[in-house]
Curated annotation (Swiss-Prot):
<comment type="function">
    <text>Non-reducing polyketide synthase; part of the gene cluster that mediates the biosynthesis of elsinochrome C, a perelyenequinone phytotoxin structurally similar to cercosporin. The first step of elsinochrome C biosynthesis is performed by the polyketide synthase elcA which catalyzes the formation of nor-toralactone.</text>
</comment>
<comment type="pathway">
    <text>Secondary metabolite biosynthesis.</text>
</comment>
<dbReference type="InterPro" id="IPR009081">
    <property type="entry name" value="PP-bd_ACP"/>
</dbReference>
<feature type="region of interest" description="Thioesterase (TE) domain">
    <location>
        <begin position="1695"/>
        <end position="1893"/>
    </location>
</feature>
<feature type="active site" description="For beta-ketoacyl synthase activity">
    <location>
        <position position="521"/>
    </location>
</feature>
<protein>
    <recommendedName>
        <fullName>Non-reducing polyketide synthase elcA</fullName>
        <ecNumber>2.3.1.-</ecNumber>
    </recommendedName>
</protein>
<feature type="active site" description="Proton acceptor; for dehydratase activity">
    <location>
        <position position="1116"/>
    </location>
</feature>
<feature type="domain" description="Carrier 1">
    <location>
        <begin position="1441"/>
        <end position="1518"/>
    </location>
</feature>
<dbReference type="InterPro" id="IPR006162">
    <property type="entry name" value="Ppantetheine_attach_site"/>
</dbReference>
<feature type="domain" description="Carrier 2">
    <location>
        <begin position="1552"/>
        <end position="1630"/>
    </location>
</feature>
<dbReference type="GO" id="GO:0031177">
    <property type="term" value="F:phosphopantetheine binding"/>
</dbReference>
<dbReference type="InterPro" id="IPR020841">
    <property type="entry name" value="PKS_Beta-ketoAc_synthase_dom"/>
</dbReference>
<dbReference type="GO" id="GO:0006633">
    <property type="term" value="P:fatty acid biosynthetic process"/>
</dbReference>
<feature type="region of interest" description="C-terminal hotdog fold">
    <location>
        <begin position="1245"/>
        <end position="1393"/>
    </location>
</feature>
<dbReference type="InterPro" id="IPR036736">
    <property type="entry name" value="ACP-like_sf"/>
</dbReference>
<feature type="region of interest" description="Product template (PT) domain">
    <location>
        <begin position="1081"/>
        <end position="1397"/>
    </location>
</feature>
<dbReference type="InterPro" id="IPR014043">
    <property type="entry name" value="Acyl_transferase_dom"/>
</dbReference>
Length: 1906
């Protein structure tokens, strides 16, 4: 049997040969080239052995060589290894010699036994056994298998520790602890001795109902005796988008699981773990181990409404499973439950897995989030819990533990792996063990003996003396017996008092402590919480104070001082010993009897590297998943750099290493290329200002690798890369070895010593060039940059073939070396040369052809770049002619004239060399200049290729153009030159386009590391996954992981509140429970309700026309207009507030509802026509403030907010506290009441008014409905404006369901209004006072309609005639309520009349138009005209300014109201000067709203202070600009109906069921995912928003059930990963009918024209475009695009609609298509779509259309603004729509422009194939002028660099080249007719004289002219 190895393609060919075709063969799992002497040299062997010392060693067991069969003799270990390495790499295995060799060696031994240990193949083993038996050996029975080797990708180094004895390194830790959302915050709690216990948070459960009264003999069912705990206040916060979780799923996921994700991610980040970066972080070698002991969330919270994610969200097995799933780890995941020791048990399992080699990295943690009150009740009833507060560890009064919450995660590796991977190490675990207290008196009690056994075990396993332990972190739950028992076991083990040699010396103190006294007992997370504390202690070198002893130390503890043991009552310094380590014992036990303990020690000290980092430029990366997180990450980095500027370990190189190689990178990216830390900070600030990284790359960029040709070499090329990069140096060394093996000159010296360059032969230089390029290729690939296509110039094409896997390295070197040697042998150096000329081939021929000069065209590099070749004399002869023709030229420094006849003598020999080469199929396309095309098949290569490559001219331009046409090259790609200088890549850019980014690999006189840094920075920000570890590999001093700021999460709260205390009633008989409801007389429907403990919103509505509410809202009539009183809003707010009390966490009886800041914004008039009139109330709950902000608005018929009338703030207040406060003010109020009553009997101005008199007194102001007349009498002091009233509700109807009847509220508040409108000093004919709301309404008890109440108020004047007063409400002597800050505004009577009647008109008449509201555009079909139509042509004579009617009317209103003549209201008139104050502003704005329908805020007159600025302001609202009138003379012309019909454009409106379906699909997606519809943009990835397989099932099921859409359940969101792709799929499923015009379907020449603007069909401007009766010009209006649809795929939506519309008019071709501007792009796309279906295109006309080779550039907003401002859109476009001259642009126009451009932005049109159904004639019509060439003001310069795009220049710059431009690339090989509309620009060519020229060109194209 023979073993044969070779490269796979070669081996395949070998096995196909006749000799081996029938041989028995099988593959071996060997994929490296072993036993290959042609590949390896002695130098390779020495490289492998370079780390092995040459130590003398004696061989104990003889080693028999597998190559010779003889015993290896070696004096040193290094020699023995050399023999082994040589046998592996260079020598053949001689199985036939092994067995005889062994037998020969042992044959002289006196009797020996043979025992087979199975380490070799059975055949070889049998041969050896047979040979030994023949030599006299005795066979022993049985077979011993070799030790089982666990698979691991870790390769231990010579100094590594055996795996089973390795220390376990803790790399990092992250956690959430009570009052500590981070590790640093946790240290703050510890070092300050903070006790974090408090009553249960309202988000957990209501302590008032769940904590029983301890004074009772027996606690109520399911209540506990304590409400204390240590809580995570931010447990609800989570970044769902980061973890691809939908807002629907996130609340259902247990907060413990969510926090485990957050902390695991933070821990991995701090550890610098990038999955897959090293062998120990391969995803299948990572395991996750978590301790968790309860399922609170799914038992209590999510179980209240079980949904799709109930199981994966709540089951604790998903805690580690979710981490594995998110990071795609495929190692084991375990959830461990051993009660209180769960997390330490998980840690134990993880350590065991590391020691056994089951995993190489372990993620370990514990979680404890308490939301189920039952667990607390059970623990309390089991006497576990303290009823007095926190864990009082070591306290004499300790009475149990306090439950605590925590989630923490740490990352572990074996120490050897961590050191090898340059990981940060915080501490090391030496040993960990677990046992059980089997002998304990109770299962829940620990056993001293068992714990002592455990401590002895871990100390022995760790090899640590008990006196070396300087600190013990106790379990320390806080019971007298438990603390005493644990302390006894610890001290007996660590600080015994006998025997004497075991006693601690004075310098060996032991400290004990427990974190539970600070943060409670974290139960399943208790162990990792203690570990977090100790890690912080090691980091801070401090033992924090113990805060558990509240009274005195537990008297049951052993005597501590006698054992040199102490409890730190204040912070104690704990420095690391010099040249030593601190060692700690941590103890953790379980209520179920388990005990776990571990030994921890300091991390090994990291040696300082003195090797400097020679790089000048360093790259610093910041990335995030969302723009918000990116911004905060940058800010955090800046703050960190400021804080750590003096840190000793902070260097720019280490910052670069940590932020690049040791971070997982996200889509939103910022990269800084800096030379100092200060420049990093400056660049980060710039990135913030410019919002860099706010948009994410749309994908990974594609690269073209360009390989330099001959002539660019220079001395020192690649020298710095050779010196600085090990991989590059190794590649060059390997190529040098191949060169020598193939008998070519060596090349390595050119990279080591640049001085050797001068003496190098052409062969050496050419070999060095291709070796350099191949090494560069491997360098880029190592860095993660791979090409999608390659191109090489001349010699560089060989390296390109290697990059494309066509040739091997050896084959490239063989061909290039042979070619060069043949040239040296057969061609004379220096006899020929080459000349680079700046010209195109045609002009060159024109210049040189007539002269008869001889030359050869060697290279066609670009449109204006060619290279000539010939003899030196030929070249010198033609140079003068070229200079006379102004063709710049340069002689190239080359020894031969390549690609000319000079090389012909070598072609036959070169072909012979090539025939021995294997050419493989290209792995990527090869853009081949040798053939001027793209090569993709193995058949494209061979010996013939090599010959033609040598002789043919280099047609670089043709090859690149071919690649462009095949879409293998475009300007969105990136290009890298692989060679000494960036030469070829410039040629690529010329064809690819100006946006094509180019990068060099090397430049003369520029450090290669700087070049590399610049390129990688660009690649990274474009989305490339750079292999940063390789980038930093050769710079060891940089490889230190810094503790950078944690990821800035984009946190939102997700919480399901436990409600209604249902846990208290488990097992009870069903009860009819009265729930707080919202519906009533003033609230008819709950639209939506998300109120909860953490916040939320509520939307309710009421129909004011409904019979139960309608009378209430017509209670006050002012000037005959029924107005709704604020009391209606108050009742709604009180109802909402009462409902919200259940979420406050307080008892409902304790809290009252306050209606604060009631602000009346506008009058609400109730209609009387019986039609529905909806009042909507929106309430937003602020959980922290316990308040709700409310707005009250009416809706229009479409359900949209029409007008907001009022707003207020609902507050929850403590009733008893408010009662106490009011009680203190009651005496003063009662005193004032008494004084008023006494004044009635004295001479003065105080009078009492009866009920009849009260309402009669204000009758001319307001008519009160009887139900609102509850004031029985008032006593009024007109001088003091003070009054008291008596209120009685016996005559007020009690019908209806209210919180507080609005009539009651209104009556109690009326006193203030009567004081202001009924005092003797008021003149109601001139002025009156209206209610503007109040500051506060508090009712301490419900209003009793059977009682009589007293009210008191005193009004005081404020500013601007606003009067306020506090109305106190008394029930007898008791104050039961107060209206604080009741506000009444003085208003002129006529203004009030305006306000009221304007409100009435808005409600009952035509509502005024709100400024800026989009207006519906009505498109009508052309009418059938039966009479002569007169058209007019207006000829310009003069222009004069004229004001818009709205402006003149507004000025007239100001004139009338102010009394100032309109003529005097000039632009510079100040409103202050003419007395326009806030009140007059209200009147003016009211009239403008009423008469003009323009909604002007009265506050505008306080901000806009002059008439001129007011006009500008008003124009902004109406969308108009200052206009000019045109004085014209009019010519009338009659047109017949036939002529009119023939000249008109028929509009087509695209409507479609598909978009309706899509809208519903969006709604389902939003509903099921919880994402707002507005966030479902086209580029949204479903995976990013958490649409997983479960949600996919739900969505697909609903689509099937509701819309009969049959979509794949499992793969829908895999096949269509973005919103845009799904929309294309959905809209493609459903039909999109179009309405087409009824134009003459029998016409001979149908054409399609695609205008971008609305065109009025009667416009004479377009008459020249009309054809004769038998010819129809049909317009298909563009698809009405909106911003929502702008990101959708073009082909699937807009294009389909065009084609459908066209084929409704004309089912089949031939078609004549035309389009103007972007419409030309659409016409081109429609043509291709029709051709694809087999339809024929007769003609295609493109009218001033930009070529869509690379999509259309976006136009900046300032372009549109400028066009509007100078009149292009207001003037030119009005000519297109003459009936609306100078009018405001349609609302749809700008969005349509922008959406069209956005639609076509990514449409890179493919070339049109040259098929039989392609257009027979292609016509391109350019506009001859430019709009900004004089007629209109030029566009001002951009304020930002890069804002002006090439696409904008198409419209803003005068065209000078009227050729086909880039359209020629889209019609390869086709002739394009070109016409120019002279004297017209882009926007005017479609009308008037432009249209006359255009019509002629169209007729010519259509063949309608003779």
């Amino acid at each position: 049997m023979k073993h044969v190895s070779a490269p796979p393609p070669v081996l395949d060919e070998l096995l196909k040969t006749t000799a081996l075709s029938k041989a028995i063969k099988f593959d071996l799992p060997i994929t490296a080239p072993y036993h290959a002497p042609h590949l390896y040299t002695a130098e390779n062997v020495n490289t492998i052995l370079c780390g092995v010392d040459d130590v003398v060693a004696t061989t104990i067991i003889p080693i028999v060589s597998s190559s010779t069969g003889t015993v290896v003799t070696s004096a040193t270990f290094r020699d023995a290894l050399r023999v082994a390495v040589e046998a592996c790499l260079q020598l053949m295995i001689r199985s036939d010699l092994i067995a005889p060799g062994i037998a020969s060696h042992v044959q002289h031994a006196d009797g020996f036994a043979i025992r087979h240990i199975a380490t070799a193949p059975d055949g070889l083993a049998l041969a050896v056994q047979t040979a030994l038996s023949q030599a006299g050996g005795r066979s022993q029975s049985g077979r011993v298998n070799a030790p089982d080797q666990n698979d691991t990708t870790s390769i231990p180094n010579a100094l590594s520790t055996p795996r089973a004895k390795a220390k376990i390194a803790i790399l990092s830790m992250s956690g959430r602890f009570p009052q500590a959302p981070s590790m640093e915050a946790f240290w703050h709690v510890l070092e300050n001795g903070i006790d974090t216990h408090e009553l249960a948070l309202a988000s957990r459960w209501n302590t008032r109902t769940h904590v029983g009264d301890l004074s009772l003999k027996e606690l109520p069912k399911n209540t506990s005796g304590t409400g204390f705990g240590c809580w995570l206040h931010d447990a609800a916060q989570f970044d769902a988008r980061y973890f691809n979780m939908s807002p629907r799923e996130a609340p259902q996921v247990d907060p413990a699981q969510r926090l485990a994700l957050l902390t695991a991610t933070e821990a991995l980040e701090q550890a610098g773990i990038v999955p897959g970066r090293t062998s120990s972080t391969q995803k299948d070698r990572v395991g996750v181990y978590f301790g968790s002991t309860s399922n609170d969330w799914m038992e209590t919270n999510s179980a209240q409404n079980i949904d799709t994610y109930f199981i994966p969200g709540g089951n604790r097995a998903f805690i580690p499973g979710r981490i594995n799933y998110h990071f795609k780890f495929s190692g084991p995941s375990y959830t461990i439950d051993t009660a209180c020791s769960s997390s330490f048990t998980a840690l134990h399992l993880a350590c065991n897995a590391l020691w056994k080699g089951e995993v190489d990295t372990a993620i370990v943690g514990g979680t404890n989030v308490l939301t189920n009150p039952d667990m607390t009740v059970g623990l309390d009833r089991g006497h576990f819990l303290s009823r007095t507060g926190n864990c009082s560890t070591f306290d004499d009064g300790a009475d149990g533990y306090c439950r605590g919450e925590a989630v923490a995660t740490l990352v572990l590796k074996r120490l050897d792996d961590a050191v090898a991977d340059k990981d940060p190490v915080q501490a090391c675990i030496l040993a960990i063990a677990t046992n059980h207290s089997a002998e304990a008196a109770s299962i829940t009690r620990p056993h001293v003996g068992a714990q002592q056994d455990l401590f002895a075990s871990v100390l022995a396993d760790a090899g640590v003396k008990h006196t070396d332990i300087s600190y013990c972190e106790m379990h320390g739950t806080g019971t007298q017996a438990g603390d005493a028992g644990e302390t006894t076991s610890v001290l007996q083990s660590l600080a015994p008092i006998e025997p004497p040699n075991a006693v601690r010396k004075q310098h060996q103190p032991l400290y004990i402590g427990a974190a539970k006294s600070n943060v409670g007992h974290g139960e399943a997370a208790a162990g990792v919480t203690s570990l977090a504390k100790v890690l912080l202690m090691l980091k801070k070198s401090t033992i924090p104070p113990h805060c558990g002893i509240k009274t005195k130390i537990n008297h049951k503890l052993p005597d501590l001082p006698s054992r040199n043991t102490a409890i730190a009552m204040e912070a104690v310094s704990w420095p690391r010993p010099v040249n030593g380590k601190r060692q700690v014992l941590l103890n953790n036990f379980s209520a179920a009897g388990g005990n776990t303990a571990l030994i921890l020690e300091d991390a090994p000290e990291v040696p300082t590297l003195d090797v400097p980092d020679i790089r000048q430029c360093h790259l610093v990366a910041v990335s995030a998943k969302t723009p918000a997180s990116l911004e905060n990450n940058v800010k955090n980095m800046l703050a960190w750099l400021d804080e750590k500027s003096d840190a000793s370990n902070l260097t720019l190189a280490r910052l670069s290493y940590t932020s690049t190689a040791r971070r997982i990178h996200h889509p939103h990216r910022v990269m800084i290329n800096a030379t100092s830390l200060d420049s990093v900070k400056a660049s980060l600030r710039t990135a913030l200002d410019l919002k860099k990284g706010s948009s994410r790359p749309k994908g990974t960029p594609r690269f073209v690798f360009a390989f330099t040709g001959q002539g660019a070499q220079y001395a020192g090329m690649g020298a710095d890369l050779f010196a600085q990069f090990t991989g590059f140096r190794a590649d060059i060394s390997r190529y040098d070895q191949i060169c020598r093996q193939l008998n070519f000159p060596p090349v390595r010296q050119l990279f080591e010593d640049p001085t050797t360059f001068c003496d190098a032969t052409p062969t050496t230089l050419q070999l060095a060039m291709v070796c350099f390029q191949m090494a560069l290729y491997r360098m880029w690939v190592t860095l993660g940059v791979t090409p999608s296509a390659v191109v090489g110039h001349s010699l560089g094409e060989y390296a390109a073939l290697y990059a494309a896997s066509v040739l091997t390295q050896a084959d490239v070197i063989n061909i290039v070396g042979s070619r060069a040697q043949l040239l040296e042998k057969h061609c004379e150096q220096g006899s020929h040369t080459m000349l680079a000329v700046r010209s195109n081939a045609e002009d060159l021929e024109a210049a040189l052809g007539p002269s008869g000069l001889t030359y050869e065209l060697s290279c066609h590099n670009g449109r204006e770049s060619v290279v000539l070749g010939g003899t030196k004399s030929q070249i010198e002869t033609i140079r003068p002619t070229l200079q006379r023709s102004r063709m710049s030229n340069r002689v190239l420094e080359v020894p031969y004239a390549y690609h000319t006849s000079q090389v012909e003598p070598i072609l036959a020999s070169l072909a012979a060399v090539a025939r021995g080469v294997h050419f493989a199929k290209p792995a990527i396309p090869v853009i081949s200049p040798a053939f001027g095309t793209v090569l993709t098949q193995s058949e494209d290569f061979g010996s013939d290729f090599i010959v033609k490559h040598c002789r043919n001219k280099v047609n670089m331009l043709g090859a690149l153009q071919a690649a462009r046409q095949m879409s293998l090259l475009d300007e969105k790609m990136m290009g890298i030159e692989l060679g000494p200088e960036p030469v070829v890549i410039k040629m690529v850019k010329e064809v690819a386009g100006p946006a094509f980014q180019t990068f060099a690999s090397s430049r003369k006189d520029e450090p290669a590391l700087n070049i590399l840094a610049s390129a990688l920075s660009a690649f990274y920000t474009a989305g490339t996954d750079v292999k940063w570890t390789a980038y930093h590999a050769d710079f060891p001093s940089a490889q230190v992981v810094l503790e950078l700021p944690a990821y800035a999460w984009d946190l939102k709260e997700y919480w399901i509140q436990y409600v209604n205390d249902w846990s208290l009633r488990k097992g009870d008989a069903p009860l009819v429970i009265e729930r707080t409801t919202l519906e009533g007389t003033c609230i008819h429907k709950v639209v939506s309700n998300s109120l909860g403990v953490s916040g939320g919103e509520l939307l309710v509505e009421a129909d004011l026309s409904r019979e139960d509410l309608h009378p209430m809202v017509q209670g006050h009539k002012v000037y005959g207009v029924p107005l709704c009183t604020p009391s209606v809003y108050a009742d709604i707010a009180l109802t909402i507030g009462e409902y919200a009390k259940q979420f406050s966490g307080e008892g409902s009886t304790k809290l009252g509802v306050e209606i604060a800041n009631m602000n009346i914004q506008s009058a609400l008039v109730a209609t009387s026509d019986g039609k529905p009139q909806m009042l909507r109330t929106h309430a937003s709950y602020d959980a922290k403030q316990k308040s709700l902000y409310c707005t009250f608005s009416t809706l229009d018929d479409a359900g949209k907010v029409k007008e907001q009338h009022s707003n207020c703030l609902i507050k929850l207040f403590d009733v008893e506290a408010a009662r106490t406060a009011l009680k203190s003010s009651a005496p003063a109020i009662k005193s004032r009441i008494s004084i008023l009553q006494l004044q009635l009997n004295e001479f003065g101005n105080t009078f009492r008014y009866s009920k009849a008199m009260i309402y009669k007194m204000v009758g001319q102001l307001a008519d009160f409905d009887p139900k609102y007349r509850a004031l029985e009498e008032i006593t009024l002091d007109s001088d003091a404006l003070e009054a008291l009233g008596r209120v009685n509700f016996t005559k007020v109807s009690a019908e209806g369901k209210f919180h507080t009847n609005p009539a009651y509220i209104d009556a109690l508040s009326q006193l203030g209004g009567f004081v202001m409108n009924g005092n003797e000093g008021v003149d109601l004919d001139k002025e009156l006072f209206v209610n503007h709301g109040w500051a506060s309404l508090k009712l301490l008890e419900a209003i009793d309609p059977t009682k009589t109440y007293t009210t008191h108020v005193k009004m005081t004047e404020g500013t601007d005639k606003l009067w306020t007063g506090d109305i106190t409400i008394l029930d007898g002597e008791a104050v039961v309520g107060v209206f604080g800050g009741v506000a009444l505004q003085g208003v002129p009577k006529r203004l009030m009349s305006y306000i009221v009647h304007a409100a009435s008109k808005r409600t009952n008449g035509v509502a005024p138009r709100t400024a800026g509201e989009p207006q519906t555009q009505r498109v009508t079909a052309p009418e059938v005209v039966s009479a002569v139509v007169k058209t007019t042509t207006k000829q310009l004579v003069t222009q004069a300014p004229v004001e818009d009617r709205s402006i003149t009317t507004a000025i007239s209103i100001i004139s009338q109201e102010s009394g100032v003549e309109a003529a005097d209201l000039t632009d510079d008139t100040s409103f202050d000067d003419i007395g326009v104050d806030s009140l007059l502003g209200i009147m003016v704005s009211s009239r403008i709203r009423d008469e003009l329908g323009i909604d002007v805020d009265s506050a505008a007159f306080l901000e806009v202070r002059t008439v001129g600025s007011f006009k500008t302001f008003l124009r902004g609202l109406t969308g108009t600009t200052e206009q000019f009138t045109t004085v014209t003379k009019t010519v009338t012309k009659e047109i017949t109906p036939t002529e009119l019909r023939e000249s008109s454009f028929a509009q087509s409106a695209v409507a479609g069921d598909s978009f309706g379906v899509w809208t519903n699909v969006l709604a389902i997606l939003a509903e099921e995912s919880g994402i707002d519809v507005s966030d479902l943009t086209g580029d949204t990835y479903f995976s990013d928003i958490g649409v997983d397989s479960l949600l996919s099932l739900v969505v697909v099921s609903r689509l099937r059930d509701e819309f009969d859409l049959d979509l794949p359940e499992q793969s829908l969101f895999i096949d269509y990963p973005t919103v845009a792709s799904l929309k294309a799929r959905i809209t493609g499923c459903t039909r999109s009918p179009s309405v087409f015009s009824d134009s003459d379907a029998t016409t001979d020449v149908p054409s399609v024209f695609s205008p971008s603007l609305e065109v009025e069909t009667t416009s004479e401007d377009f008459q020249p475009l009309a054809f004769s009766k038998k010819e129809a010009l049909v317009a298909v209006a563009e698809v009405a695009l909106t911003p929502l649809e702008k990101a959708d795929p073009f082909m699937s939506i807009g294009l389909a609609s065009y084609v459908e519309s066209l084929q409704r008019h004309q089912p089949h071709g031939p078609y004549h298509l035309a389009g103007w501007s972007a419409g030309g792009v659409l016409a081109y796309a429609v043509a291709q779509e029709l051709m694809a279906t087999g339809e024929e295109i007769a003609t295609l006309t493109l009218i001033d259309s930009p070529p869509p080779t690379d999509g259309l550039d976006r136009l900046p907003r300032r372009f549109f603004d400028h066009c509007s401002a100078v009149g292009i859109f207001g003037g030119e476009m009005s000519a297109i729509n003459p009936s609306n001259k100078r009018a405001k642009l349609p609302e749809w126009l700008m969005p349509h422009f922008e959406a069209t451009i956005e639609l076509l932005h990514d449409y890179c049109a493919p070339p049109m194939p040259l098929t039989t159904n392609a257009p027979k004639k292609i016509n391109l019509i350019w506009a001859g002028g430019c709009a900004f060439g004089g007629k209109y003001a030029p566009l001002p310069p951009a304020s930002m660099v890069g804002e002006d795009t090439e696409g904008m220049k198409f419209l803003t710059e005068q065209r000078t080249d009227f050729g086909p431009d880039k359209w020629t690339d889209l019609f390869p090989g086709r002739h394009i007719d070109i016409d120019v509309v002279e004297g017209e620009h882009h926007f005017s060519m479609m009308r008037g004289k432009g249209a006359q020229q255009l019509g002629g060109f169209l007729r010519k194209t259509l063949g309608l002219l003779a």
